[in-house]
């Protein structure tokens, strides 16, 4: 049974081209700056995002943490969303390792932070308050199911940051998904950012790694932070080779738009089933959430286990208490897999019997 894994786009496997490139990659000691493949990857990422330099890191969490600690000192503050990955899913690392205080705002349904709230949250020059240093945005915003933040909004936040002498960091784990959905370049989306991180191992299919980009001075300082976090790697070009293919081939808008179309198709199929509630207006990129009715013939936990045991389909509960699930499409979810998932969930919910009875 071939597994259909919809838990996340982090489950993607390296493509055959990536595996071949990894096997023959030129390598060197990256701590000495001598790995030619990593140097090429960093330069490519910087060029694609319109920045001066890049730095390869082991994960998105390390990339965000390195960026935050490069921008902020101990006791200083960053403004970000309550639903931001940095705040919710990175183990409080900025506070734990850097003493950086998070000041959180509610993320709007479209993934943005309210501009007036951002302005009002910036601290006055007062000894009783931490010093505001940084604004963090996430694009796409995973906390509201992959909402892409448009260029116009990114520019407005950049203007606010500059007006107040702050820095802007963009967690762009799925930045190329945002670019594909909006019909713009990734470079345009981070033009006003002082730093950005992009993940290579989600929808882009590389096995490991992220790249952070910024000015040469920022990256020079980030090198030291990365080292202090244990992120210096030796012959990392084996990983960088896959990253180069991720950026050159898998980040293309036409490639990622397929994932978005499959997410839309899957959502529409599920929305037509009984006992499922799903807001199609929230299906904007490659992920969405659905709810299972309380009177469904199977519990949320039962649905999850039956799909795995009987159909080889893996899904992830967003909240079992709320009977909700998040589904994420990626390179290994195509039209055939979409049809199988809709059919399997329909069978478990008794869709045919429900239609006959109706």
What is each model feature region?
Residues 1-310, 317-333, 337, 341-358:
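Conserved PLP-enzyme active-site core in the AAT-like
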């Amino acid at each position: 049974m071939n597994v259909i894994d919809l838990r996340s786009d982090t489950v993607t496997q390296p493509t055959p081209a990536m595996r071949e490139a990894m096997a023959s990659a030129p390598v060197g000691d990256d701590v000495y700056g001598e790995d030619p493949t990593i140097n090429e990857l960093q330069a490519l990422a910087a060029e694609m995002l319109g920045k001066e330099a890049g730095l390869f890191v082991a994960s998105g969490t390390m990339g965000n943490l390195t960026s935050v600690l490069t921008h902020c000192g101990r006791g200083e503050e960053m403004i970000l969303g309550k639903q931001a990955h940095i705040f919710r899913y990175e183990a409080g690392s900025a506070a734990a390792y850097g003493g950086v205080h998070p000041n959180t705002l509610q993320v709007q349904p479209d993934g943005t932070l309210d501009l007036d709230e951002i302005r009002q949250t910036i601290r006055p020059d007062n000894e009783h308050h931490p010093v505001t240093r940084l604004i963090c945005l996430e694009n796409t915003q995973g906390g509201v199911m992959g909402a892409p933040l448009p260029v116009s909004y990114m520019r407005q936040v950049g203007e606010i940051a500059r007006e107040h002498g702050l820095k802007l960091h963009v967690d762009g784990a799925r930045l190329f998904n945002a670019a594909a959905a909006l019909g713009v370049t990734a470079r345009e989306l981070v033009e006003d950012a002082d730093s950005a991180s992009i993940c290579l191992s989600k929808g882009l299919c590389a096995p490991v790694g992220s790249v952070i980009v910024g000015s040469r001075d920022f990256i020079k300082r980030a090198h030291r932070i990365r080292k202090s976090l244990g992120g210096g790697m030796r012959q990392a070009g084996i990983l960088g080779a896959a990253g180069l293919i991720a950026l050159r081939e898998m980040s293309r808008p036409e490639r990622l738009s397929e994932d978005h179309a499959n997410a839309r198709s899957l959502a529409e199929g599920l929305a037509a089933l009984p006992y499922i509630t799903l807001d199609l207006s929230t299906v904007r990129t490659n992920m969405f959430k659905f709810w299972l009715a309380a009177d469904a013939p199977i519990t949320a936990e039962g649905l999850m286990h039956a799909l795995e045991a009987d159909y080889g389909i893996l899904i992830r509960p967003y909240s079992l208490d709320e009977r909700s699930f998040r589904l994420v499409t990626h390179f290994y979810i195509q039209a055939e897999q979409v049809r199988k998932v809709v059919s399997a969930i329909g069978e478990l919910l008794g869709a045919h019997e429900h239609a006959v009875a109706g």
